[in-house]
């Protein structure tokens, strides 16, 4: 089968012919139809320090996908050939304390699809049946392909109650934009998103945020005054990993506010902990998706009218993957989809 493979310890990916994956008695074989390019994939493509330390070559990469089931193992009773499915990108051990307690997203022995085991940038992928999510009938395949990052957005945005609250989102990348849309759909009063990239701020505006703020041009304090806010934001969603963005968030939260933090800083990050203590802020780290509560929430939100399709801005055939990675690296894109059919 054709696959995009990290076959050399240098920048780039290579389209190669590799064996079709075999399945065990508890596995599902999926014919991949669409994939999304993730920031993780860009790191692997560029072969940065994290990728060099993490990826063992050769490795077929990619973890955002939708496909059609082709075959199932003999123990698989709940999935059938023809089902349209995606897969949870974290394969857990099933035996640790967190897994036994139903907190599988906290498994310390997680294996990442397309990172620690063969990925979805291929014509076929095999996964354990416990990692398979069947989509509702009629779902747009491009949207289904980005359930992984959409799940990051939902997990972050719904970590704290947002009904009637004022929500600040720092970082207007695709996940930040989707998180803002989720908070709005969940009845937040105001959703304000910040960034420095005009393209992405414009994209955020298309998905209905209350304000898309270029912090080079406008201060959050002034935005609060325009909206009639007097005590700061109630909920913060830190999606950027940018120290300045996080410090700006801390300075604009109400006393007792809650912050969900998905953005990963490049290194150690200094903040004024006195603000956290005296303002009694709660900061919660977010990683991945809750298995599978987040997936239920994603499906229900789409079925109840949430439209995230505008966040998908570019589409290519997998043979044109270089164009997809180029536009992703430019910063002037939302989600980028590769077609495999």
From Swiss-Prot:
Q: How is the cofactor bound?
A: Binds 2 Zn(2+) ions per subunit.
InterPro entries from the UniProt entry: ADH-like_C (IPR013149), ADH-like_N (IPR013154), ADH_Zn_CS (IPR002328), GroES-like_sf (IPR011032), L-Threonine_3-DHase (IPR004627), NAD(P)-bd_dom_sf (IPR036291), Zn_alcohol_dh (IPR050129)
Pathway as given in its UniProt record: Amino-acid degradation; L-threonine degradation via oxydo-reductase pathway; glycine from L-threonine: step 1/2
Reactions performed catalytically: L-threonine + NAD(+) = (2S)-2-amino-3-oxobutanoate + NADH + H(+)
Q: Which GO molecular function annotations are given, in alphabetical order?
A: L-threonine 3-dehydrogenase activity; zinc ion binding
Q: Tell me the superkingdom of the source.
A: Bacteria
The UniProt entry, under Gene3D superfamilies, shows: Medium-chain alcohol dehydrogenases, catalytic domain, NAD(P)-binding Rossmann-like Domain
May I have one GO cellular component term?
cytoplasm
- Chain positions of site Important for catalytic activity for the proton relay mechanism but does not participate directly in the coordination of zinc atom: 148
Provide the binding site for NAD(+): 175, 195, 200, 262-264, 286-287
For whether the record's keyword set contains Cytoplasm, the answer is yes
Q: What class of enzyme is it?
A: oxidoreductase
Q: Which family does it belong to?
A: Belongs to the zinc-containing alcohol dehydrogenase family.
- PANTHER family noted in UniProt: L-THREONINE 3-DEHYDROGENASE
Q: How does it assemble?
A: Homotetramer.
| Name of the protein described by the UniProt record | L-threonine 3-dehydrogenase
Q: Which species is the source of this protein? A: Solibacter usitatus (strain Ellin6076)
């Amino acid at each position: 089968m054709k696959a995009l493979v990290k076959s050399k310890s240098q920048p780039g990916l290579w389209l190669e012919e590799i064996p079709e994956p075999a399945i065990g008695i508890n596995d599902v074989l999926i014919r991949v139809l669409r994939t999304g390019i993730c920031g993780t994939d860009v790191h692997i493509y560029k072969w940065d320090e994290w990728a060099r330390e993490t990826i063992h070559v050769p490795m077929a990469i990619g973890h955002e996908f939708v496909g059609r089931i082709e075959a199932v193992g003999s123990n698989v009773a709940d999935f059938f050939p023809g089902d349209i499915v995606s897969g949870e990108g974290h394969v857990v051990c099933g035996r640790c304390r967190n897994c036994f307690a139903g907190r599988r997203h906290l498994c310390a022995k997680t294996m990442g699809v397309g990172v620690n085991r063969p990925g979805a940038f291929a014509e076929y992928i095999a996964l354990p049946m416990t990692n398979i999510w069947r989509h509702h009938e009629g779902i747009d395949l491009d949207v289904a392909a980005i359930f992984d990052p959409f799940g990051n957005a939902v997990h972050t945005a719904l970590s704290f109650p947002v009904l009637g609250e004022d929500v600040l989102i720092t970082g207007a990348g695709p996940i930040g934009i989707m998180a803002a849309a989720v908070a709005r759909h969940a009845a937040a009063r105001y959703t304000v998103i910040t960034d420095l990239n005009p393209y992405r701020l414009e994209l955020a505006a298309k998905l209905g945020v209350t304000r898309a703020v270029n912090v080079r041009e406008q201060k959050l304090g002034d935005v609060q005054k325009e909206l009639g806010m007097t005590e700061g934001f109630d909920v913060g969603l830190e999606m950027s990993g940018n120290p300045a963005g996080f410090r700006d968030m801390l300075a604009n939260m109400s006393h007792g506010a809650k912050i969900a933090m998905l953005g990963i800083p490049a290194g150690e990050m200094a903040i004024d902990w006195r603000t956290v203590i005296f303002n009694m802020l709660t900061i919660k780290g977010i990683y991945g998706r809750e298995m599978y509560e987040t997936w239920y929430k994603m499906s229900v939100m789409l079925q109840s009218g949430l439209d995230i399709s505008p966040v998908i801005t570019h589409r290519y055939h997998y043979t044109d993957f270089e164009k997809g990675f180029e536009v992703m690296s430019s910063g002037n894109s939302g989600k980028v989809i590769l077609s495999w059919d």
